[in-house]
Amino acid sequence: MRERRGTLRAPPGLARKGLAVNDIPAADAAPPVLAVERLVKTYGGTNAVDGISFAVRRHELVGLLGPNGAGKTTTINMVLGVLEPTAGAIAIDGVDLARDRARALARTNFAAVYAPLPGNLTVLQNLRFFGRIYSVERLEARIDALLERFDIGRFRHTKCGLLSSGEQTRVCLAKALLNEPTLLLLDEPTASLDPATARDLREAIRAVARETNGGILWTSHNMYEVEEVCDRVLFLSQGRILLEGDPRELPAQHGAASLEELFIRVAREPLGIEGAVR
C-alpha cells in the first residue's frame, strides 16, 4: 500500500528553518535514494533555490511542481552534478555528492523529452553506446530486457530520428534505466505525447518504481498526470518548498477544487500560501 502524507513543509525562515533530512522518517532501514538538505543556489545575490530540504524514498515517486522559474530545473541540475550548490548537501543512496561525485552519480540517471538521443544512430547503437559509458555488465541482456519492457524491440535497427515522439521517449527511458539507477529523474517525460501513449508510459514508469529498489523524482505541469502517478508532491515557488503532501489530498486541505487550482494559487499567490503555512 502506498504511503499517504498530508503534511505541510514550512519554508526556510519560518519557525522550522528548513527540515533536516534526518528529520524525515525512512520507509525502511536503508537510506533514502535522494536526500537534499538546506540546498541553496545563488545567482548574482538572488537565491534561485532557497534552503530546500526533502527526500525521495525507495519505491516512491515524488512530483516536483512549480511555475516556470520556481527553481525546479536548478534543483535537478544540482542533483545531477551539473551545477554546484552554493550551500547545502545532496546524498544519493547514502553517498554524499560533494565528497564522492562519481559513486553518487553512478546511482543516478535522467530522461526528458527535450534531451533526445542522437537521431543518426539506431536504437541498438544508442543503447550500446550509453551502456558502455555506464559500464553496464551483461549489456546485451540488459538491452534486450529494456526493449521488451518498453515494447520497442521492433525498432532495434531503426534510427532514432525516424521514430515518433512516443517511441523516442520510450527509447530515452530505456537508456535511463540501463545502469539500473537507484535515483531516476524525469523532467516532463510525457510532454507533447498523445493521451494514450502518455498513459502507457505512466504505467511503465509506475511499474519501475514498484519493481526496482529505487525511487523517482518527476517534474510535470500536467496536474492530472501528477495526481494519477505521484505518491507525494512538493510545491516549489521562488526557490522554496511551500507545500508537501499527497496530491489527492492537498487540494481539499487548502480549499482548492483540484490540484490544478492549487498549483495556480501557489504560482500566483506564493506569499498567501506561505502565510497559510504559518
Predicted regions and their residues:
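Catalytic Walker B motif of ABC-type/P-loop ATPase nucleotide-binding domains
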Residues: 184-188
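Conserved ABC ATPase signature
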Residues: 159-163
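Helical segment within the ABC ATPase nucleotide-binding domain
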Residues: 199-212
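Conserved catalytic motifs of ABC-family nucleotide-binding domains
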Residues: 180
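ABC ATPase "signature
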Residues: 244-245
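Conserved ABC ATPase "signature" region
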Residues: 109, 128, 132-155
